[in-house]
């Protein structure tokens, strides 16, 4: 029995997400199963623009951007699970619960985001996310997103 891996390269990610540099925080999808899970990677470079001020002499990847990277991974999973959006629709980051930061992420790290689908209720989908560096948890959170027409 073989296990099939589903990967997405940057060109496919750019077709799914509206984010662009410097706010695109997913470099590659390593594996996913529609409606279940997605594993993606962000290669953290010292050339990221926010490292100039966060923090001079001790660059640390901002925690809020770790959460955003996980949220972008949930967006890709949602798109691959339910299809592309109609014109005028967006997926909105609707909420976050139980966010915890365990250790810093620094230049040179390869951050792996693992997100799993939990449930959809009243148009809001809940995902569990974890970010890892070298197999160690750096952040975990429960995130919600909603599909909606632009205001």
From Swiss-Prot:
| Pfam families xref list | FabA
Q: Which GO terms describe its molecular function?
A: (3R)-hydroxyacyl-[acyl-carrier-protein] dehydratase activity
Task: State which Enzyme Commission number(s) the record gives.
Answer: 4.2.1.59
* Enzyme type, top EC level: lyase
**By its UniProt entry, which SUPFAM superfamilies does this protein fall under?**
Thioesterase/thiol ester dehydrase-isomerase
Q: Where in the cell is it found?
A: Cytoplasm
Reactions mediated catalytically: a (3R)-hydroxyacyl-[ACP] = a (2E)-enoyl-[ACP] + H2O
Instruction: Cite the entry's keywords alphabetically.
Output: Cytoplasm, Lipid A biosynthesis, Lipid biosynthesis, Lipid metabolism, Lyase
* InterPro entries named among the record's database cross-references: FabA_FabZ, FabZ, HotDog_dom_sf
GO terms under cellular component: cytoplasm; membrane
GO BP of this protein: fatty acid biosynthetic process; lipid A biosynthetic process
Active-site feature positions: 54
Q: What does this protein do?
A: Involved in unsaturated fatty acids biosynthesis. Catalyzes the dehydration of short chain beta-hydroxyacyl-ACPs and long chain saturated and unsaturated beta-hydroxyacyl-ACPs.
What does the sequence similarity comment in the record state about its family? Belongs to the thioester dehydratase family. FabZ subfamily.
Task: Please report the name of this protein according to its UniProt entry.
Answer: 3-hydroxyacyl-[acyl-carrier-protein] dehydratase FabZ
State the organism's lineage: Bacteria, Pseudomonadati, Pseudomonadota, Gammaproteobacteria, Enterobacterales
